[in-house]
Amino acid sequence: MQEKSKPVDNLRADAEKIITRAIAAVLPDAAVERALKGKTFLGRVYLVAAGKAAWQMAQAARACLQDNFCGGVVVTKYGHVNGEIADVACFEGGHPVPDENSLRGTDAALALTEDLTESDTVVFLLSGGGSALFEKPLLPLAELQDVTNQLLAAGADIVEINTIRKRLSAVKGGRFARHCAPAQVFAVVLSDILGDPLDMIASGPAYPDSSSCAQALDIAKRYGLRLSERAWALLAQETPKTLENVETQITGSVRELCAAAAAACEALGYEPMILTDCLCCEAREAGSMLASIARTHARDGKNLAFLMGGETVVHLRGKGLGGRNQEIALSAALGIEGLSNALVFSVGSDGTDGPTDAAGGIADGETAQLMRQKGVDAVQSLNDNDAYHALDAVGGLLKTGATGTNVNDVTVLLLRTAE
């Protein structure tokens, strides 16, 4: 049963409901339980979870794994461990750039899964963020951090970044599964990459690598990466192309996130349209595009919702603070100024957006004007990649806290019937 239409000033209340319902639909607990339901593992059972959703996935899995359980390791982002899990050691590390604690957690996982037998099973829970959090570098950590920072600053997408990182790691590109052999690996994957390419999610620690050394070298040259001789040599080496000890199941994706958001929009009286669940472009361009759609349909006399899912990129031009979702909102704010019935929000399903405490940003037709009243130059803030401070000045930051899931971002334009 649909809720009655609300006045324009309730657009933000609608946005909050949509965000809450969409994220709730892709939480990993039930998905992990479904993946493990009816599974019987012979011999000893070990649990390794890596990524921003690792703690929540591990908690659900631990409740299912009772017989022959021999221990586990969780490696997740700072602030994402929400308590103890019986017989499971929990580590927090750096993201999006790995740090010493990322390495400590990975070392613990490698030690736990060393010298296993054919009758043993490693239940491997993988989610977005695993590329930074699950790491055993073949280079000094400082050098690996520098390579990652160069790629991020150049605007490389997640596939390109992972193609490079898996060749500089002892666990990525199928190498963790090879380490676990001859034990069986049952991998449960929460997908954060468009199209669900298993070899790219968290750089594919338990999946054969489909990328080539030629592709890695091309990426490095195209972005002008400054690399040591050792790094160039590693990029020229191939990764495992076959793994016979792994079974993989995908659970959760951006497609499900968009579908849940669309259902929430419909329940609130909007006519939803999912424009794409494979969004991959410059963040500010996505914001401008939605603003153009808003101006086209603002007077249609309907309650409309246009949705996009995916992961945009930000080419750093300034030294400000922000994230891709905040930049979408700031860009949209400039384009929808004066439209009293329009609102745009963009949020990361994991509850984080860039190196900030915000999950994303929200803007309506009054946001740009409010910024001017606060002495904030929205255009300059966008050029400086300083969306965080611009939005913060007008209450435009979305802060959900860590959600425990990670299936990319969802961006929504809401249009209410103009009054």
Go through the PLM ranges and name each one.
Residues G269-S346, G354-P355:
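Active-site segments that bind and position negatively charged phosphate/pyrophosphate groups
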Residues M1-R44, V48, Q56, V81, ...:
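N-terminal amphipathic/basic leader segments beginning at the initiator methionine
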Residues L330-E419:
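Internal helix-turn-beta structural module
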Residues A60-N68, D87-C90, L110-E114, P137-Q150, ...:
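A glycine- and small-aliphatic-rich helix-loop capping segment at beta-alpha/alpha-beta transitions
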Residues V75-S119, V159-E160, I164-R165:
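Glycine-rich oxoanion-binding loops at beta->alpha junctions
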Residues V48-A50, V73-T76, F124-G128, A187-I193, ...:
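Short beta-strand segments
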Residues P140-R226, L235:
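Internal gly/pro-rich beta-alpha loop/helix module
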Residues R165, A183-F186, P208-M289, I293:
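Accessory alpha-helical/coil subdomains and C-terminal extensions
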